[in-house]
């Protein structure tokens, strides 16, 4: 029997100033989270103008969480992208969050490694929300503050080991190809 650890967290924040988000805020949140995580978890980014130069890349906590290294496919002579062990759901966010308002979004962590780094992930969100999300966030003051990082769902997935596995994803993702 295999176990896959999946947990969904509700991240609530309070705006200290007006926040303008794009219509699809997921990529803005992902970018803010990635920058904050790199600043606190990558040992080489601060010395290389924000670029991760860790070698091997698997040794970098930032890369393992946010930008996993490609892996060689078994029985094939090519590399395959590896999805990061998280999903950000921003469908609940409005495009405007006014100063003093609270808002929330969700983050789902997948796998034991991501769960073992939950404290680092929470710290990265705290920093990302303070530095700013969305447009116009370079004011020098904390744009918003983390109110809570709460577990809201932890499904129990158990299955027998098999050669065939079918996974169906339901996503709020907005997929574009060449800008369309």
What are these regions, as identified by a protein language model?
Residues 1-180:
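RNA-interacting cores
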């Amino acid at each position: 029997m295999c176990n896959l650890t999946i947990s969904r967290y509700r991240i609530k924040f309070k705006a200290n100033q007006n926040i303008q988000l794009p219509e699809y805020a997921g990529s803005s949140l992902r970018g803010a989270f990635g920058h904050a995580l790199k600043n606190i978890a990558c040992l080489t980014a601060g010395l290389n103008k924000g670029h991760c130069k860790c070698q091997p890349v698997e040794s970098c906590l930032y890369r393992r969480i946010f930008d996993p290294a490609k892996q060689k496919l078994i029985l094939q002579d090519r590399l395959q992208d590896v999805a990061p062990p998280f999903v950000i759901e921003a469908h609940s966010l409005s495009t405007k969050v006014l100063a003093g308002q609270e808002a929330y979004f969700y983050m789902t962590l997948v796998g034991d490694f991501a769960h073992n780094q939950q404290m680092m992930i929470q710290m990265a969100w705290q920093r990302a929300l303070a530095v700013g999300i969305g447009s116009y966030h370079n004011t020098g003051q904390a744009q918003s503050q983390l109110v809570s990082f709460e577990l809201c769902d932890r499904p129990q997935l158990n299955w027998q080991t098999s050669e065939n596995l079918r996974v169906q994803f339901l996503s709020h993702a907005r997929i574009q190809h060449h800008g369309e």
